[in-house]
Curated annotation (Swiss-Prot):
This is 1-deoxy-D-xylulose 5-phosphate reductoisomerase. It catalyses: 2-C-methyl-D-erythritol 4-phosphate + NADP(+) = 1-deoxy-D-xylulose 5-phosphate + NADPH + H(+). It comes from Yersinia pestis. It holds the Pfam family DXP_reductoisom. Homodimer. Belongs to the DXR family. The gene is dxr. Pathway: Isoprenoid biosynthesis; isopentenyl diphosphate biosynthesis via DXP pathway; isopentenyl diphosphate from 1-deoxy-D-xylulose 5-phosphate: step 1/6. 1-deoxy-D-xylulose 5-phosphate binds at residues 125, 151-152, 186, 209, 222, 227-228, 231. Keywords: Isoprene biosynthesis, Manganese, Metal-binding, NADP, Oxidoreductase. It comes from the Bacteria. Its EC number is 1.1.1.267.
């Protein structure tokens, strides 16, 4: 039985992970749960899965959780803060760590799991977007095992030779017969919306994804296709791919989750019903296969599968992310930070949908930054970019 720590247990990925545990209780045991401030949901999770430990992001939330659990007779030990999250990610008797805390906030605990040599189920793409080489160097040094959770990266992983799977981030695609990775994306809810209407898009409209059920931040990223841009950056690091070895294709049906093209002309693709429980179950049980609880794909109901080239006028954030990736780690760190701030401002109705790209581009182009050589330097770039993004937002509101 695999012992599991879930970082970000009350989020979308965390809940899907617990759904897989629920479907396979003989295979997985939850040892620790880590979340932000959603006390009531964390209490429900603790009562159902009886973890030994739980941690909240702040002491006030932790105190509230202790009171709720004490009323129910739970003996789960409750802690708070980033240090606690890192300690629970590195517990000696934990086999797997689901790294699903959204944003740069998830970096310290994800790195703690890596440094402890755990099998890390990586849903926190920001770890690679901001720390790329530094992160992969830690993986190599600690001999941790990375298993990608994003549906696209998991699809690519499944379609690659086992030799690459076992040496993720360091094997040569070319030497293993791979010519190109094809990263697919639906295009989000505004794929056919007239560009003239983009400035009037509301947060609720942006969060109404046609195929996937996701959190609000990632839903907005999907609408701008920044999510695909961030996935592009992540894929470059995860699969040791050059710019010439990866392309992005729009696939509105979200049935083919990504593809790998080989030298002999073959293309391997992973297909399935769009449900995050599928890649989560694959990574949790790897190299075995277990029930995910997802309904099987019905090809007759799906009908046609279509593909188009992304339009950068419609999706300028995608182009911005690809350009940042080619510029280096400082640019991708700044972009990620600016995007977190701008999306938050949009969700709070402080800026327009079209302002997201403007803010992101202004931050990336306006900061003159050296390439980071440590995680501490990455965090400095992150803070600077957030400050500049906040200043740009303030100017837009004046």
């Amino acid at each position: 039985m695999k012992q599991l720590t879930i970082l970000g247990s009350t989020g979308s990925i965390g809940n899907s992970t617990l759904s897989v545990v629920r479907a396979n209780p003989e295979l997985f045991k939850v040892t620790a749960l880590v979340a932000g401030r959603n006390v009531r949901e964390m209490a429900q999770q603790c009562l159902e899965f009886s973890p030994r430990y739980a941690a909240m992001s702040d002491e006030h939330s932790a105190k509230s959780l202790r009171l709720l659990l004490a009323e129910q007779g739970s003996d789960t030990e409750v802690y708070s803060g980033e240090t606690a999250a890192c300690e629970l990610a590195a517990l000696d008797d934990v086999d797997q760590v689901m790294a699903a805390i959204v944003g740069i906030a998830g970096l310290p605990s994800t790195l703690a799991a890596i440094r402890a040599g755990k099998q890390v189920l990586l849903a926190n793409k920001e770890s690679l977007i901001t720390c790329g080489k530094l992160f992969m160097d830690e993986v190599k040094r600690s001999r941790a095992q990375l298993l990608p959770i994003d549906s696209e990266h998991n699809a690519i992983f499944q379609s690659l030779p086992e030799r690459i799977q076992r040496q993720l981030g360091y094997s040569s695609l070319n030497e293993n017969g791979v010519s190109r990775i094809i990263l697919t994306g639906s295009g989000g809810p505004f794929r056919e919306t007239p560009l003239s209407q983009f400035s009037d898009v509301t947060p609720d409209q942006a969060c109404a994804h046609p195929n996937w059920s996701m959190g609000r931040k990632i839903s907005v990223d999907s609408a701008t296709m920044m999510n695909k841009g961030l996935e592009y950056i992540e894929a470059r690091w995860l699969f040791n791919a050059s710019a010439e070895q990866i392309e992005v294709v729009l696939h509105p049906q979200s049935v083919i989750h990504s593809m790998v093209r080989y030298h002999d002309g073959s293309i391997l693709a992973q297909m399935g019903t769009p449900d995050m429980r599928t890649p989560i179950a694959h990574a949790m049980a790897y190299p075995m296969r277990v029930s995910s609880g997802v309904a099987p794909l019905d090809f007759c109901k799906v009908g046609a599968l279509t593909f188009t080239t992304p339009d950068y006028q419609r999706y300028p954030c995608l182009k911005l992310a690809i350009d940042a990736c080619n510029a280096g780690q400082a640019a991708t760190t700044a972009l990620n930070a600016a995007n977190e701030i701008s999306v938050m401002a949009f969700l709070d109705s402080k800026i327009r949908f079209t302002d997201i790209e403007v803010i992101n581009r202004t931050v990336v182009e306006g900061l003159l930054l050296s390439e980071p050589t440590s995680v501490e330097e990455v965090l400095v770039i992150d803070r600077k970019a957030r400050d500049v993004a906040a200043q740009v937002i303030a100017k837009l509101n004046n």
